[in-house]
Amino acid sequence: MPIAMGLETACELECAALGALLREPREAERTLLLDCRPFLAFCRSHVRAARPVPWNALLRRRARGTPAAALACLLPDRALRARLGRGELARAVVLDESSASVAELPPDGPAHLLLAALQHEMRGGPTTVCFLRGGFKSFQTYCPDLCSEAPAQALPPAGAENSNSDPRVPIYDQGGPVEILPYLYLGSCNHSSDLQGLQACGITAVLNVSASCPNHFEGLFHYKSIPVEDNQMVEISAWFQEAISFIDSVKNSGGRVLVHCQAGISRSATICLAYLIQSHRVRLDEAFDFVKQRRGVISPNFSFMGQLLQLETQVLCH
């Protein structure tokens, strides 16, 4: 089968073959699956074992450098790159949305550049570099049980009609906390006081982004407080790294964290947006759209949005 120029040795893997590998625990552990679709598409649904590949205009420019530099941009996890370098993985599989073969990949797109970088860096080693034929769209058709679906939106946008809503309850308190990522939830102070709701979500830790909301269940959950007010004078960015480290610590321990403020609209939403920007290297507008799809009432104040834009610049231009 013809292969795109520069990718002559890339093998093409069928969806059924990948599904069989992922169903074998030993083979699944030795398979690195790299999803080159946009971040929002990945979060809506993805192969459970896959890792998202960051991509934006700046990374596009940097990925055109040396293969090692391209791989560092597209696979920023140093520990994972080290595992590849030591030959600990049997295969690295790259996928996009629906390309039928390597020959269809745009030369300046993330899948093509990542395949080329992997081939160069893995040459002569035990790791096979593969492209998934038909991409995620085909794999989801063949192996839906191996794919993860995004949770349904739990809270409608402000002003939206909802026949099940209680007019006595503020819209920001209706429903329950919303899942942003499998280990990251966003909600209000009222949600943080609902023990049954927290347990139903599997929450193990709470990040309280307020100076006034109490920590209701100190003996049951791991709490961290960021005592800031929701006003234009607050430098919430001073807390970004501390908050991100806390969320990552909960993630790494296998737990789930609820981030909340009084209404779950401005302060806690800002922290969740900062986490997405830094951890997933996405633009603010992408992160904002993603979170708003899940919690329609979010609206960080003007100053907080400016601080998030500064973070975006620092992260994406680093």
UniProtKB/Swiss-Prot annotation:
GO cellular component: nuclear membrane; nucleoplasm
Enzyme class: hydrolase
Mutagenesis / variant outcome for changing R294A: Loss of phosphatase activity. Loss of phosphatase activity. Does not affect interaction with MAPK1
Pfam families: DSPc, Rhodanese
Places the protein is found: Nucleus
Keyword Glycoprotein carried by entry: no
Consequence when changing R61A: Does not affect interaction with MAPK1. Loss of interaction with MAPK1
Active-site positions on this chain: C261
Entry's induction text: By mitogens.
Function text: Dephosphorylates both phosphorylated Thr and Tyr residues in MAPK1, and dephosphorylation of phosphotyrosine is slightly faster than that of phosphothreonine. Can dephosphorylate MAPK1.
Name this polypeptide is given: Dual specificity protein phosphatase 2
Gene it is expressed from: Dusp2
